[in-house]
UniProtKB/Swiss-Prot annotation:
Biological process, per Gene Ontology: endoplasmic reticulum calcium ion homeostasis; protein insertion into ER membrane
Entry protein name: UPF0674 endoplasmic reticulum membrane protein C2G5.01
Single Gene Ontology MF annotation: calcium ion binding
Record field: transmembrane: 49-68
Membrane topology recorded in Swiss-Prot or TrEMBL: Single-pass membrane protein
Organism: Schizosaccharomyces pombe (strain 972 / ATCC 24843)
Amino acid sequence: MINKKLLFLVFALAKGVLADEEDEYEEDYNMNPELENPGMFKHVDWRDFRLEFVILACFFLYVFSFITQKKKNQKIASRWYGSLQSSFRQQFAQYGPGPNSSPIIYDSPTEFSSYLTGRLNVKNVYTTLQLFPRQDLLAYSLNQIVEILLGNVMSSVLPVADRFQFDLTLADQNLKAERFVFAIVHKDCMRILREIRYDLSFTRISSSPYLPETHVLMSENNECSQAIFEIPEFMSSINECIENLEYFIVTDQPSVPPATEKDYVTKPRIEASIRIKKITSLSGLSNATGSALFNSLLLVADSCPKFQWRPEVSKKLTSARKLAFEQVVHASAAKAAKKKVKSSGDISKLSESDQKKRMERERQRKMRRRAKKM
């Protein structure tokens, strides 16, 4: 009985304490009107969105820069090609892809091109104006860092820059002219071009009294080099653009290493590139170097059909091309044989029924090929 009374007393005390705490909590809650009806943005401050503001500012800055710098590249291309237009139209019957279209072809925000045809000794000319990606701040910064820290020492391609390139193909009637490889290359581009261009593997590197210390001569034979250097007005035109000249290549061999004999296509042509340095303003943009390089290409194109080498020189050049073709054929055959051995090994791992099915498919494929030939 005493225990029951004691338990009842403890229960009553506990209930009283809890009731007092609830009353106190209700009073505190009612005393704070802000907690009674808190608004959605009552406690939101602009400083809580500082990161978002920074991200939006960077985004709008990027968009603004992309639009303005893209227009700047277009203005540079228009001014550059416009200043060369008179020379192009004077030398060629057609400037641009068609009579009713713009002569400047927009390939990308950083690349513009054009086309020339209709001239003696020249089949066609493709020109390309590659501009630095000014519209992309991130790419621009990364390229600047690479240029400063590494330059083109660790790169397998020419560094991104403002440059103007020519790709001139000689006319078909010049296909029987003497074949050779000749190049004037800037020392900064020599290693890269030697690695990526197949045709320059035919040449030897040497210095020349005709060239400054910044450039080297890459040629198959001294007689070929001397013939080009002695073309009237050629050296005067080259010297006008030599400061910006990256390479001037006369070749008949493919620039990309041929994988098979079908890829080994010879085409007499002249390729050249100049680097446009420090475009600070459109008003100060000059294309004197572009005009000089263009004139140099035409002088060589007109002289190539007239070149005649001594018999021993012609024999040496012909032997080098025959050997190169045989090496390509041999490498292609070795690759095909290796692939065939691998295929035979794969067949041997199949079951007998699968081997028969595969052999039957091969037999049917050969029969269809014969039927097409007939």
